């Protein structure tokens, strides 16, 4: 089954909408097809496969932050082309140069087209996801809006920390912006010490 939600945002130029869908009751090692629709625009059919529990390959990407995502798009596409049997991709943070700039998020999403619409991805935030439009540290609101991540960490710090299993590997994703976290959530370390 599937359920979805939309979030309206503004990048200072145009309104944008971020849509999420949560799929449940998927079967292990099964291929699925889907497509998206916005108004009268319907995408082509895309497919993905769920974890079968066996050995797997992942494409791991470093910082992709850029003023122009043309080069990054070519690098990401080539890495995936050379690893078409990859089960998932992992992006190690600093996806965009400025975390509150919606234009950069849209450019990053376009640069990952053909990859993230076919295999699942695990993303983590870097310090660039924490920049405001005036280049000061800020809560990573755009990052948190763009990704619907497993909700299995501390409820007060949703999507900053999460974990998931793929095959026989347990992945743990951490947010290492410790000084910023302490500023935004002053009781974080005391609370976690008691857990």
Regions found by a protein language model. Name each.
Residues 2-16, 59-74, 99, 180-194:
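Acidic/histidine-rich helix-loop elements
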Residues 25-27, 52, 60-66, 168, ...:
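Short, flexible loop/turn elements at secondary-structure junctions
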Residues 1-60, 77, 81-82:
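Acidic, histidine-bearing metal-coordination/catalytic regions of metal-dependent phosphoesterases
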Residues 14-16, 31, 57-60, 90-93, ...:
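A generic short-segment signal for beta-strand/edge and adjacent turn/coil regions
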Residues 22, 31-38, 42-47, 104-195:
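Extended active-site neighborhood of metal-dependent phosphoesterases/phosphodiesterases
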Residues 55-130:
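Conserved, compact domain cores that house catalytic/ligand-binding motifs in diverse enzymes
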């Amino acid at each position: 089954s599937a359920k979805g939600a939309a979030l309206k945002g503004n990048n200072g130029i145009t309104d944008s909408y971020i849509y999420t869908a949560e799929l449940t009751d998927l079967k292990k090692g099964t291929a699925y097809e889907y497509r998206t629709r916005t108004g009268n625009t319907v995408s082509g059919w895309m497919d993905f496969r769920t974890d079968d529990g066996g050995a797997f390959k992942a494409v791991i990407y470093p910082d992709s932050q850029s003023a122009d995502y043309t080069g990054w798009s070519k690098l990401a596409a080539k890495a995936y082309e050379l690893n078409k049997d990859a089960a998932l991709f992992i992006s190690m943070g600093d996806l965009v140069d400025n975390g509150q700039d919606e234009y950069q998020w849209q450019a990053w999403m376009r640069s990952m087209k053909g990859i993230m619409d076919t295999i699942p991805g695990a993303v983590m935030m870097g310090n660039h996801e924490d920049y405001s439009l005036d280049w000061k540290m800020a809560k990573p609101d755009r990052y948190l809006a763009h990704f619907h991540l497993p909700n299995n960490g501390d409820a007060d710090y949703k999507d900053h920390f999460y974990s998931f299993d793929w095959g026989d590997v347990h992945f743990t994703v951490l947010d290492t912006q410790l000084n910023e976290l302490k500023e935004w959530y002053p009781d974080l370390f005391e609370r976690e010490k008691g857990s």
